[in-house]
Structures are given as C-alpha cells and as structure tokens.
A protein has these predicted regions:
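Extended, charged low-complexity segments
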Residues: 219, 235-277
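Trp/Gly-enriched beta-strand/coil motifs that build multi-repeat beta-propeller-like domains
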Residues: 130-136, 270-282
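Short solvent-exposed loop/turn micro-motifs enriched in small/polar/acidic residues
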Residues: 20, 32, 53-56, 81-82, ...
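Surface-exposed beta-loop interaction hotspot
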Residues: 99-150
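Long compositionally biased, domain-poor regions of proteins
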Residues: 59, 74-91, 98-102, 158, ...
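Short, solvent-exposed coil/turn segments at beta-strand boundaries
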Residues: 20-26, 40-47, 64-68, 88-96, ...
Length: 282
C-alpha cells in the first residue's frame, strides 16, 4: 500500500512515478547526530527503519528525481501518537544522505503545527568507508521565485532569503482561482485574501548542482487557522520539476502524509520581494 491515499491525487497529478529500484536493498546510514540507521527496502511497498534502538516497519513512497538520487517518504500506519514522519534524500552516487524528521504535537500552544529536524550523513560503503562531505544549507535560491503548476492550481513560491519564503499568485493563477474557487478571493475583512503576501520559515539544502531540498513551514497559517503543515520538496531546477510531501493535518483535522509533484517556470516576483514583511523583522 502506497503512503499516498487516493484523495490526494489532485496534488499528485504531476508527481513522478513511484520508483522500485531499491526493492530488496539495504543501506547503512552514518548520521552526524550519532544515531546511525539501517534503511532496508523489504519489497515494493514496505521498508524497515532501524535507529536509536527502535525498529519501524512502514509503507513508503520512493521517487527518483535524478540518476541515483531518491526521495523516500514513510511513516508508521496506522498513525501513532506522537506522530513522526521521516523523509530521506538518498544520493547513492555521492554516498550522501539528508534525513528530515517531522513530528506533530511537540508545541503545546500549536499542537497541529509540525516541528522539523534535519540530520545530515553518509552511506557506509561495502569497504566501510564514508564520504566526508555533506549536503549543506545554501543561499543559492535566495532572491528567486518559481510558479509551480500542480495541475489543478498554480502557486508561486518566492524564496525571499536563506531562511524565509513568500507566496505569490500569478495572473494565470488568479484567473484559475476566480474560475474554480471564487471563495478564496475574499478575506474576512473584505480585502482579497489571495493577494496578501504570506511569509514563513524555510530551509534550503543543496543536494547537487541544480538539485535542492526545500522545507517550507506554515506556522503563521497555524496560528491563524489552527493547523499548518511541513511541505518538503526535492526540486530539480534543471528540468523545473519537483516532488514533495505534505506532513501534518488537513482543514478537517485529519492526519495526512502524502507525496505530490509539480512543474515550474521562473517568475518575476519583484513586487512581492520588495514589500515589508507582515510577520518578521528582517
């Protein structure tokens, strides 16, 4: 059983096909936090994850974004409390790995806002060696923006700086919203809600040239509406195609953890970048 449920297909129209190349293989992950892990792909649907004396058997999605580079997302089912989702970016060519741990319920004031932690590491080779290099945080994407097409809607992500992102809507996206979801055009104060510039925390990690892992949080949305998610992407900016996963809850309060994908085009977000932040002191 795939991690993704049928009800999420609208976000997954452009998701790359699931990859089964790792079936039957196992990897020893040497992690910088001192807790090494074993990642074992039992079959096309289930993996085993051993770490810090714990063993989890989980359904998973694996997506191949470049040759020998995989986006692997999993969480125990049925969901256990407190929830912990794991996403692994595995670069077999370079022997490097980045793991994103997403937990729910860590913040007592915002129990429906995920907390994310990144751990970097390397894949142990058959001779016992490990690559001394690591994936790392980067400023390469700062000052750029991309209009992402998810098939049913468009949204532009503005990578404001090394630590923040903003949301913008192109004229094409606004027209699609007017046509398909007119209720999104009006805010509670009478102003067009969709035209406000939303800003929040972000992490940008370089995996390879042109390939970036990006984590976008929705903390301000959670403060306003009671729930927000962690959106974690692996972006291939040479082909302008990404995959990702959404971890947290939906508007109905139901748990969710699913993978998706989009195609992107460069977008001039000079206006959105020039506006003073409504949320943070820069």
């Amino acid at each position: 059983m795939s991690v993704s449920y049928d009800r999420h297909e609208g976000m997954s129209i452009f998701r790359p096909p699931l990859c089964f190349e790792l079936t039957g293989r196992q990897f020893r992950l040497v992690m910088d936090d001192g807790y090494d892990a074993d990642l074992i792909f039992l079959d096309r649907e289930t993996l085993l994850f051993r770490r810090a004396g714990e063993e989890k058997r989980c359904p998973y999605d694996c997506i191949k974004m470049e040759e020998q580079c995989y986006f692997i997302n999993f969480e125990e089912r049925p969901f256990k409390e407190p929830r912990c989702g794991v996403t692994v970016v595995l670069d077999e060519r370079e022997g490097l790995v980045t793991v994103c741990f997403a937990t729910l319920g860590k913040n007592p004031k915002l129990p429906r806002m995920p907390y994310t932690e990144f751990v970097f590491g390397a894949v142990e080779q058959p001779d016992g060696s490990v690559n001394p290099l690591r994936h790392g945080y980067t400023a390469e994407m700062a000052g750029t923006s991309i209009d992402w097409n998810y098939g049913t809607f468009n949204i532009a992500h503005v990578y404001q700086s090394e630590r923040f992102y903003r949301v913008a809507f192109t004229p094409r996206a606004l027209e699609r919203i007017r046509r398909n979801s007119p209720e999104m055009m009006a805010g509670s104060d009478g102003r067009p809600a969709i035209r406000r510039v939303y800003e929040d925390y972000a992490d940008f990690i370089k995996i390879r040239d042109g390939l970036f892992a990006v984590n976008l949080l929705e903390t301000n949305l959670c403060r306003r509406n009671g729930h927000g998610n962690s959106l974690f992407f692996l972006m291939n900016l040479k082909e302008m195609h990404d995959c990702g996963r959404s971890f947290g809850t939906n508007a109905e309060g139901l748990d969710e953890n699913y993978t998706f994908g989009a195609f992107g085009t460069r977008y001039d977000a000079g206006r959105e970048m020039s506006l003073e932040s409504m949320y943070y002191i820069h």
